[in-house]
Amino acid sequence: MSKVTSSTLLKYKQEGRKFTALTAYDASFASAFDGEGIDVLLVGDSLGMVLQGHDDTLPVTTADIAYHTRCVRRGIERSLLIADMPFMSYATPEQAMENATTLMQAGANMVKLEGGHWLLETVTKLTERGIPVCAHLGLTPQSVNVFGGFKVQGRDAENAQRIIDEAKALEAAGAQLLVVECIPASLATAITQALTIPVIGIGAGATTDGQILVMHDVLGISSGYIPRFSKNYLKQTGEIRSAVRAYIEEVANGSFPSAEHTFN
């Protein structure tokens, strides 16, 4: 089976074929997800919450992400591997270059950065030097203290237009993928239609080109608050690989995310 690349995902978008992504943090789970056909694996800074037990993602370091990226890389053959750049690891273009290089050398195919217009120079410099970028808009968890909590973004017209404008600008700067998180489904639709690059949604409705979830939510092993946009597939299947297959099938046929997982 051929490896998934950014070109593969672009082809999927052009064909109207939905694709799936999951977080992964170790070789064993990554191998299972890869083997069942998950297209994209993200070593997310969500590990700060689901693995390290923090209340948010801010304590995660580049060294943490690099370690787990190396673990995941050893377990996969097909999936595209994206590594999150953690809080304050890309405050300047120079800092971003150094830390992104570390993550690419750890085995990532692409790095993910949260932010809008202020990131444009950084995105351009990274892509010009051979480091592919996945951008991230909407609810950006590293800005949780600015937002005043984990809240849906883009519900008013002004902020919705700002997010659309930032999405277009990030694409023009060289981003090859975009994640949109916790935004109204109508806004996600507008962004997906406005961009040539694939758009991956989480809590953003069913019209994005792909969907991503945190593996701990999919497998029902998260502690504490479970986001509305998530679904426990292990509960309905009883087996990890079957849960992953059910997730893939429901994204492909459009039954996930449903209205109960979507914000308006």
UniProtKB/Swiss-Prot annotation:
EC number in record: 2.1.2.11
Example of a GO cellular component annotation carried by this entry: cytoplasm
Entry note: cofactor: Binds 1 Mg(2+) ion per subunit.
Chain sites annotated for binding Mg(2+): 45, 84, 114
Cofactor: Mg(2+)
Protein name as catalogued: 3-methyl-2-oxobutanoate hydroxymethyltransferase
Species: Shewanella oneidensis (strain ATCC 700550 / JCM 31522 / CIP 106686 / LMG 19005 / NCIMB 14063 / MR-1)
Keyword Magnesium listed: yes
Pathway: Cofactor biosynthesis; (R)-pantothenate biosynthesis; (R)-pantoate from 3-methyl-2-oxobutanoate: step 1/2
Function, in words: Catalyzes the reversible reaction in which hydroxymethyl group from 5,10-methylenetetrahydrofolate is transferred onto alpha-ketoisovalerate to form ketopantoate.
GO biological process: pantothenate biosynthetic process
